[in-house]
Amino acid sequence: MFKKFALPLLALLAAPAFAQAPVAAAPAAALPINAPESVTADASNRWTLELSNGGTVVVQLRPDAAPQAVERIKTLTRQGFYNGLAFHRVIPGFMAQGGDPKGDGTGGSPLPDVKAEFNALPHLRGTVAAARADSPDSANSQFYIMFVPRISLDNKYTVFGRVVSGMNFVDQIAPGEPPAEPTRIVRATLGG
């Protein structure tokens, strides 16, 4: 009887440890973007973040997978909303979160929340997705960038883009919740 339950029990106990183990980082450019040609060819679907750490990060937006989330990013970027905002929650080996004007994870834009657009895009290194509260339909202005793959988040958050350039600068975003000296978005722009 013990043998019948020992192996499955051991597998269950070990699974969380393996699921949360950091994965060796690969360059973002080496990972597939899973974007159709029509998306990658459109410069208006490039979101550029100039960071206070001296780097520039370029995100390929995916309106084919998350049209409402991408339109929200574009609208707020055109308004200058992201300029000066900090990455307020940065967990090494997991992700960097920004887009909150309050800087504590509780803020958002004055615009209404966006409904969830869960899609088939996976949480890989460089994935950019909409941060939200407990309700799936509570995304607003906050977003996060993955340092490592985390499949446990797939189909639970709206993935709307992928870093295609400057992942090394994402890796240099100051850690902390919040960081003592946070990395900021100096300027966010579209195109390029």
Report residues per predicted region.
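Cyclophilin-like peptidyl-prolyl cis-trans isomerases
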Residues: 2-8, 18-192
